[in-house]
Amino acid sequence: MTALSESEVLNDKEFPSSRQLKWILAFLCLYFGLRLLFFALFISPYIPPDEVTHLGLAKIFSKVLLLPENSVETYQYGLVTNISWLYYWVMGKLLPLNVFGISDLLFLRLFNVLFAFGTVFFSWRLLRLLTDDRLTQLLLVVVMTNTLMFSFLSGSVSYDNLVNLLAVMAIYYLFAFFKERSVGFLAISFLCQLAGCLAKLSFLPLALILVALWVLREVKGVRLLPVAVKRYCRATGWRTYLLSFAILAGLSLNIQLYGGNYLQYGSLRPSMYEVLSPDIALEHRISARDMIVEYFKDGRLSYQQAIQRTRFISHQGDRADTVYLIQRLADHRVNGYEMLGPVAYIVPWGEHIAATVFGIKGHLSMLNKGLTIVPVAVLMLLALLGSVMSWRRGTQAGIAAHLALLCGAYAIFLMYAHNYKLYLYYENFSMALQGRYVFPVMGAFYVCFSYYLMCLFRRESLRLGLAISAAFVFISLDFPFFLYHATRNWFGLLPPFF
């Protein structure tokens, strides 16, 4: 065992020391776990986004070895074919392991908690590629484990939890490849990207951005890649063949799913009424809403016919939402409606994303708006200032800059290719506009945020004060904010007895 250098001894006297870091991280993880357990135990299944549907699909997938077929039993949950199926397949294969006498809902919620811890862990590992600064590590774990919508979602059954984990893993292993030059890391990143695309369609743009980033960074050294691959294959043996098989299988499954959908239906994700029939689509609340609104906009249904069709939507809230959309579109036809332009859309989009990241948006909402969101905005501006100062000092880290570029590219794609497009179609600003859709890059964003915020000052006392202030803001806007605003409508029977 080698003796510590004088600089290492002095550095370990700063707060937090190595020992203090371990204890504080353990406490933060324990606090995070207890909160997720609270959400898993006490939140009604009718509150988290589409949890009843996710649970129903998992049960359907549990009854077959591979993939199920559409049937009368499945219609109420939408399509079970032609969809991104990986999450439901994994959850379905876990359900037979529930021999503990608890409900399937609670059992799957607890497994989703593990996905959340994995997301936090790989976000921390991503930061370690950038810096070993212990105060920055603490800040990252605080903000990751105290973002309300992420905490709330992590205690529910949702494919977003698996997608978030695969996303941060794909990002981590790609950037680990950039730093360590290990072909194995690159292969794992590609595998995570392929798995993520099978878990949710919205992973596709992230995968494309990651591949584009890899190509742009490695274009000069592309000639050396075959040599590196051969060297890696000789060194790893059977692991190479296993990874290669997994990547080829993932690629084939993606081509079969998305390529098949596009060739047969002209869309990567066809509608239920395109795959089955309009009458069957009325049995699924979201498919019914989309079909009725589309037919009304196209003139295939009159206003009265569209309103009458909504009676087939059994869920009262979804039926009311569909009626509202039809009435709004009809009113705009008569009175006109001034739509926001692409530039004017940016600020309200950002405000709503923040309100539903640091608040909750599900079948009940708890938006964080007004004065309570101001401290977060101030911290974000300070982190931005820290990035500018880091650049001016010449200490701008390449990894941080590329992570910021990645987050920006994904946000722009989400804003315009998804949210703005739906806004123009439905003429409704909040349609499918939810903060959880940015969670695939949340880990990367918080790595940049923590790193640049701690770059703002060099003096340790100022850095510590800023970190404590940021931690107080995030912690207070998570569980305390929820408890202050939650009503009895948020809570249901304990899942073991549900």
Q: Where do the language-model regions lie?
A:
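Loop-to-helix entry region of an early transmembrane alpha helix in multi-pass inner-membrane enzymes
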Residues: 81, 85, 89, 98-118
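Start-transfer (signal-anchor) and selected internal transmembrane alpha helices
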Residues: 1-37, 218-222, 227-249, 388-404, ...
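Membrane-interface transmembrane helices that cradle and orient dolichyl/undecaprenyl
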Residues: 128-131, 170-185, 196, 218
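Transmembrane-helix signature of polytopic, membrane-embedded enzymes
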Residues: 102-106, 123-146, 165, 463
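Extracytosolic helix-loop segments that constitute the early lumenal/periplasmic catalytic or substrate-binding loops
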Residues: 35-40, 52-82, 86, 94, ...
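Membrane-lumen/periplasm interface segments of specific transmembrane helices
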Residues: 216-217, 237-382
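Transmembrane signal-anchor helices characteristic of membrane glycosylation enzymes that use polyprenol
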Residues: 20-51, 59-65, 246-262, 409-413, ...
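Transmembrane-helix motifs of polytopic, lipid-linked glycan transferases
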Residues: 107-131, 169, 382-385
